Amino acid sequence: MEPPDARAGLLWLTFLLSGYSGAQAELHVSVPPRVEVMRGEQVALDCTPREHPEHYVLEWFLVDGTGARHRLASVEPQGSEFLGTVHSLGRVPPYEVDSRGRLVIAKVQVGDGRDYVCVVKAGAAGTSEATSSVRVFATPEDTEVSPNKGTLSVMDQFAQEIATCSSNNGNPVPRITWYRNGQRLEVPMEVNQKGYITIRTVREASGLYSLTSTLYLRLHKDDRDANFHCAAHYDLPSGQHGRLDSHTFRLTLHYPTEHVEFWVGSPSTTEGWVREGDAVQLLCQGDGSPSPEYSFFRQQGTQEEQLNVNLKGNLTLERVHRNQSGIYGCRVEDYDADEEVQLVKKLKLHVAYLDPLELSVPEELFVFLNSSSTVVNCSARGLPTPTVRWTKDSVTLADGPMLSLQSVTFDSAGTYTCEASTPTVPLLSRTQSFQLIVQGAPELKPNEIMPKSGNSWTEGDEVMLTCSARGFPEPKLTWSQRGDTPAEPPFEGRGWKSSSLMVKVTSALSREGVSCEASNIHGKKGHVFHFGSVAPQTAQAGVAVMAVAVSVGLLLLVVAAFYCMRRKGRPGCCRRAEKGAPPAREPELSHSGSERPEHTGLLMGGPSGGGRGGSGGFGDEC
């Protein structure tokens, strides 16, 4: 580390020296009058004669506490350099003289903080000296505080020990200040009832100083939440200052109860209602310290039923019942409290309840279609008095316990719900429902059909017929034609059942119609689907005629071929007749031996056939 500038802040000291033969000569010596350095650093002390005589000797002396001088070094210039001799005083590391003739003190300790005298001897020019003071600074260790860990009473009429603060191994002696909630405490050192401090300073073997400060205060109840700490202030070179703060701490105080609070800790209404079956907490709290005992009781007329005693101020009523409604009390057992302080607090606990709802009808209520009036009553018992309403499909039907059903239709069927609740007590509610079943003959709803195009149907058109029915008991759907699908609920619901039938439109079907019928034990109802006029399929009829003609022609050809094959072996069959009249012959018999006159007439030429002349002759016969 660089030594501080020994020339900084020079004080020129002028000495008047005597010369020979009564003549006087002046010699001035320049040294830094005060050198400040941190402990452990290095310092170099400069000593320079102002007149620069040709030859001189420079000597350094250490002045001890008694004022005695001890020679440290002798320095003599040789050209541009200085030759020095160091006289050891047992210092480690020893004193040194550098090439500029300065006295070097390495690793400065507190003991090096002395006065150093530089003496310059210049022969005929005279002798002069000057003193340089070295001041050593040391930063103390971290500030430590030891608070009083006992219980301090605010009822004491004198100052009590609060804490002890220590700042160790500093130089010069540090200073200690005290703070409450960040504000400095102006506490004197004189003993008094309100507060004071005591200070003890110790010089350690190292030469450093340790300071201990103890704070005494008369405490008040407001100090229960106060944060205290101390700080050590110390000096640094060049007029600088440092500060080391301790950690903050709080005190444990003993003070009597002045106020008591008693309330319901679990969820409750502003009126004090709690739900039956809940776990209810009763909380009691006094502002005394340490926490006193809390005694819980229930008021039974003029008597008190003792419930619990604890230090937590907490009483839990598990699964509270309606018969536990009443007046509850809390007593703070603080014998240091003032007689005027109210140590007993009471509250009234209201247990809200709601019994299961009762309906005047069974879970399934059967009524007949178009019945005049049916009244259903919902009985709700509870505290506070519940409000009741009737709903169906989340729609409110009536406010109050009475539900009147008039002119009942199938649309009236469904689930009716009685809802009871207590607006002042959240989440305390009940519901009860019944199913209304309407009995009666079926209602039928056909699905109207329209022609595919135009205003008429065409022969062969396919159409899906649908019938929907409802009633109780559930109606049965039947068709006048076969092929219907099983009944199934339609999209609209509400008890409707549907059945579908796929048919092809024909003229006969148009005349007769297609009917569907719904029936149950209470009656039946039907509907006939008509198709109106049905146009023939012209293009398709022509194709059918052509197909029949082709079939007939093919049949004739097959018959002719078969006949020819049968007659192939007979004489004169299938050959050309000779010219002239054929000879007379017997008629042929069939294979069965019977005559075939029809064949004879068909195969032989008639009277006009034999008279043909020229090249005509008989045509082929067969």
UniProtKB/Swiss-Prot annotation:
Glycans are attached at N314, N323, N370, N377. Disulfide bonds join C47-C118, C165-C230, C284-C330, C378-C418, C467-C516. The chain crosses the membrane at residues 542-562. It comes from the Eukaryota. GO terms for biological process: cell adhesion; cell-matrix adhesion. It is a single-pass type I membrane protein. Residues 575-599 have a biased composition (Basic and acidic residues). This is Basal cell adhesion molecule. It comes from Mus musculus (Mouse). The gene is Bcam.
